[in-house]
UniProtKB/Swiss-Prot annotation:
The modification N-acetylmethionine is found at residue 1. Belongs to the organo anion transporter (TC 2.A.60) family. The chain crosses the membrane at residues 41-60, 80-100, 107-131, 175-203, 223-243, 262-286, 345-366, 387-410, 415-438, 540-562, 572-597, 631-648. Residues 1-15 have a biased composition (Gly residues). Generally the expression of isoform 1 is higher than that of isoform 2. The lineage of its organism: Eukaryota, Metazoa, Chordata, Craniata, Vertebrata. This is Solute carrier organic anion transporter family member 3A1.
Length: 710
């Protein structure tokens, strides 16, 4: 018996060692995955991906004018490119939001990021498939210093590429245009799961009072991305487009030259790499966070009546959709639910109005910001790189700060739905006033020979306007590019050739008839407009204020939306939001703004006998039309905010009171009323609780199961 004890002891020791090893392995495994079991780590990862998404989106906007000149496109054409991202996103947003809410959300987000990375890489592909850029193409009269001068004295010779060859490359250019559209569609498809699934995942795992701050940080990072995108665009456009193929030391043009084309493709390669690596982090997160990392037990349940929310939220944080079909249901039966649930959501006027208001606000951003760089170039005579740099360092950081402050105010002031909608109305009014001031901040086109004033006689009737004049008829001037020069007479000419200059040092310009012959010289660039510099500085300051205040409405709008729908429908409701944002807020505005801008064109370039890009605009009409469209959209958004406010006031069912602290006079408006109580009786001074408002329509209670929907 005693002989067996050592063996038994040895076996027990081995068993204990095995158990100890297993416990140690489990401990290591737990420690290994613990870093991905924290909602704050997920927030950082989601912010990194949204930063990369915002960067690539803004980078496209920053190089639109470069693409316009590189591929000889019109503003409406580049508007189509800008809208293609939304078309791709629009195609799948509902399906991803509906089915993705029940799937592995972090992994779906990661897959979307990889698809976006592929789209970014494809966006750069046209540069490597088309011919090299020849800035002297079609302008065979350029002198030794690259200046378009009069060919009457034979100084230009017949050197240069065959114009027929350039025109034959037109078909290839059209193919590159289609490839750019396809790449943007792919980017939109990849972006589909990032925002709706990311926002719902975060909102499911944080306390309700912290949700606005987390969402505000998330959207702040999304808007901070464009700042990086514009700065990246400013850097890339200073590099010559074919710098990797040729020796740039032999170039006789600089980034300040109107013929300069920057390396627009470089930023897409960098953005593709950022998207890919930031997407990899998402594959480490679980489908739902463990209970100890998820302090959201009070998140949505406290906001709803027992009748609406009978089933408690699972401890793992995964919301089970009351409309979710059984696992045995066919795919077709599941798809049948989508239009019915969508109709059910849209029957809620608060939900519909707040989404439409958000669409109008986004429409201003999508349309106005898409052409803001072009606007700065035309109105204030800036270069593409300078315009991008200013946008990236001023307006966009202010918008980031505005979104963050909006979320912070909602959290600190404990705003309810009524308070949030009043906050949105207030910031809308202030930002609209800023847009009105833009009508008076700009520069005139100035006198342009043959376009706005006749040659040598600024008082002749408009019927005499023609860029070709007896002074340059023998110069064989071309209109396939725009290289403006400022004459000693204070008039801008389309090029040195149109000014009749017969020397590459820009002297002896025959069309400058109002000055002595020895002073008949020109200098590169447009003639400056008086007071333009002061107007630009004022515009920049007002733009920063407008961006800061206008962006503060974004987080309150999202909070109103997710607080006025059933929690089981939260992911899908966000999907409907982003669907309508794409359908109404992102796709039409660039097309509308682009077509409106083209309508103000004074002079079009020609390419192979066809109309090319606009090279000169009526700045006054441009400014009035461009800003007026934005003001109209902002005004419509205010009407929708007001309608939402009225619905919230008149159709509420009940109030939920808690003790999170009241909102006093000194804490916000320095009045005796709070945002939540404007329009109602003042809250007594000794009242320490606030009123939470939940909106439910009498005839539109939320369905409890699939059968009630079907």
């Amino acid at each position: 018996m005693q002989g067996k004890k050592p063996g038994g002891s040895s076996g027990g020791g081995r068993s204990g060692e095995l158990q100890g090893d297993e416990a140690q392995r489990n401990k290591k495994k737990k420690k290994k995955v613990s870093c991905f079991s924290n909602i704050k780590i997920f927030l950082v990862s989601e912010c990194a991906l949204m930063l990369a998404q915002g960067t690539v989106g803004a980078y496209l906007v920053s190089v639109l004018t470069t693409l316009e000149r590189r591929f000889n496109l019109q503003s409406a054409d580049v508007g189509v490119i800008a809208s293609s991202f939304e078309i791709g996103n629009l195609a799948l947003i509902l399906f991803v939001s509906y089915f993705g809410a029940r799937g592995h959300r972090p992994r779906l987000i990661g897959c979307g990021g990889i698809v976006m990375a592929l789209g970014a890489l494809l966006s750069a592909l046209p540069e490597f498939l088309t011919h090299q850029y020849k800035y002297e193409a079609g302008e065979i009269r350029w002198g030794a210093e690259g200046r378009d001068v009069c060919a009457a004295n034979g100084s230009g010779g017949d050197e240069g590429p065959d114009p027929d060859l350039i025109c034959r490359n037109r078909t290839a250019t059209n193919m590159m245009y289609l490839l750019l559209i396809g790449a943007q569609v792919l980017l939109g498809i990849g972006a589909t799961p990032v925002q709706p699934l990311g926002v719902s995942y975060i909102d499911d795992h944080v306390r309700r009072k912290d949700s606005s701050l987390y969402i505000g940080i998330l959207f702040t990072m999304l808007v901070f991305g464009p700042a990086c995108g514009f700065i990246l665009g400013s850097f890339c456009t200073k590099i010559y487009v074919d710098a990797v193929f040729i020796d740039t030391s032999n170039l006789d043009i600089t980034p300040d030259d109107p013929r300069w084309i920057g390396a627009w493709w470089g930023g897409f390669l960098l953005c593709g790499a950022l998207l890919f690596f930031s997407s990899l982090l998402m594959f480490g997160f679980p489908q739902s966070l463990p209970p100890h990392s998820e302090p959201a037990m009070e998140s949505e349940q406290a906001m709803l009546s027992e009748r609406e929310y009978e089933r408690p939220k699972p401890s793992n944080g995964v919301l089970r959709h009351p409309l979710e079909p059984d696992s045995s249901a066919s795919c077709f039966q599941q798809l049948r639910v989508i239009p019915k649930v969508t109709k059910h959501l849209l029957s809620n006027p608060v939900f519909t109005c707040i989404i439409l208001a958000a669409c109008m606000e986004i429409a201003v951003v999508a349309g106005f910001a898409a052409f803001l760089g072009k606007y700065l170039e035309q109105q204030f005579n800036l270069t593409t790189s300078s315009a991008n740099q200013l946008l990236g360092m001023t307006a966009i950081p202010c918008a980031c700060l505005g979104i963050f402050l909006g979320g912070l105010l909602v959290k600190k002031l404990s705003l309810s739905a009524l308070g949030a909608i009043r906050m949105a109305m207030l910031v809308n009014l202030v930002s609209t006033a800023c847009y009105v001031s833009f009508l008076f901040l700009g520069c005139d086109t100035g006198p342009v020979a043959g376009v706005t004033v006749p040659y040598g006689n600024s008082t002749a009737p408009g019927s005499a306007l023609d860029p070709y004049s007896p002074c340059n008829n023998n110069c064989e001037c071309q209109t396939d590019s725009f290289t403006p020069v400022c004459g000693a007479d204070g008039i801008t000419y389309l090029s040195a050739c149109f000014a009749g200059c017969n020397s590459t040092n820009l002297t002896g310009c025959a069309c400058l008839t109002t000055v002595p012959a020895e002073n008949a010289t020109v200098v590169p660039g447009k003639c400056p407009s008086p007071g333009c510099q002061e107007a630009f500085l004022t515009f920049l300051c007002v733009m920063c204020i407008c961006s800061l205040i206008g962006a503060m409405a974004q987080t309150p709008s999202v909070i109103i939306l997710i607080r006025t729908v059933s929690p089981e429908l939260k992911s899908y409701a966000l999907g409907v939001l982003f669907l309508l944002l794409r359908l109404l807020g992102f796709i039409p505005p660039p097309l509308i703004f682009g077509a409106g801008i083209d309508s103000t064109c004074l002079f079009w370039s020609t390419f192979c006998g066809e109309q090319g890009a606009c090279v000169l605009y009526d700045n006054v009409v441009y400014r009035y039309l461009y800003v007026s469209i934005a003001i109209a959209l902002k005004s419509f958004a205010f009407i929708l905010y007001t309608t939402t406010w009225q619905c919230l006031r008149k159709n509420y069912k009940r109030y939920i009171k808690n003790h999170e602290g009241g909102l006093s006079t000194s804490e916000f408006f320095a009045s005796t009323l709070t945002l939540d109580n404007l329009g109602r009786d003042p809250v007594p001074a000794n009242q320490t609780h606030r009123t939470k408002f939940i909106y439910n329509l009498e005839d539109h209670e939320w369905c409890e199961n699939m059968e009630s929907v079907l």
